[in-house]
Every structure is written in structure tokens, then in C-alpha cells.
Amino acid sequence: MRGTVDSASAVDTDMWGLRTIVADVVAGPQWSTFFSDLLGKRVRLVQARQSAYDVHPATILGSSSVAELARRSGLASVDPRRFRMLIEFSGGTPHLEDSWGGTLLRIGGAVLRGGGPVKRCAATTRDPASGAVDLQTLRLITAYRGRRESELGVGATFGLYCEVLEPGTVAVGDCLRVG
């Protein structure tokens, strides 16, 4: 299927109850019919006019935190891609990032401020390559970390949200400076 973006048909689009963005409707009746039938309710396919993010624009997670999850779960390893973090850093103790709320973080040409914990969702239970549910990450995280408070309520938290104070280029291997 193909469709064109109709910028004359702008709509306000709710982003999970957190904010509203302006988006353009993707023209062509086949799109709305296809997705409406799939979801069992009337929907429209739209394209955001500007980039959008889930809760906060950046997330960070330590590789030692992922290794600790694997160790506590009796697994050889856990693929960190399942957590969809923008930045993964190496070094430090497991869950060191939990202590960075309100702290300035510099990486590459960007400056971030640590926010609150990332409440994980069921998407993390899916293999990043196949999409198949293969690991009960929420249960595994909760088993050793408990359920923790986040801005989205109590749940299995893993990683840290960040605000971007100064945008800049970030590359693999850039040094992360805390404070």
C-alpha cells in the first residue's frame, strides 16, 4: 500500500496522555480501513510534523545493569537492545544510573540532565530480532529490584530518563562525564 501525507489535514494527536502533537493525516482510504479493521476501532494513520518521543527525549542504561539482570536471572546474557535505550554506557556498578536524577551528563557534544527511572513495559519481553516473546523481563526485574515508583506509576524500572539540555552529536565510544 502507498499513501501521501496530506499536510492540509492536520490533526492534534494524543501521545499516550502525556502531550499533544500536530500530525498530518496519511491520505488514502486503504490506510484507515486497514488499521481500523486490525484494531477493531476507527483510527487514522498520521505522520508527526516534528520528531516525537515516548516520555522523555533520551534514556540511558549501564551495560553492568543488563549484566546484573542476566546474572540474577541465571542467564548467560540479556540482549540490551530489548530495552530500546538511546545511550548504553559501560563501566560502573550495576544500576549506577539510578543515582543520576538531576545530575548533568555530558556525552559527545550533548549535555543531558538525568531524570527519573524508566518504567518498563511488555515490549521488553520480546526478542529484538524476531519480535517473539521470549523473556519475562518484567518479572525478572521485579524479582530482584522490586516494584519502584516512577512518573508513570509503580512498576519494574530499569534505566533512566534524561532531558536534553544541549543537543549535540554522540558517537559510539564517546566518554560519558557525570556531574
Q: What is the role of each PLM region?
A:
Residues 1-179:
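Metal-cofactor-dependent catalytic cores
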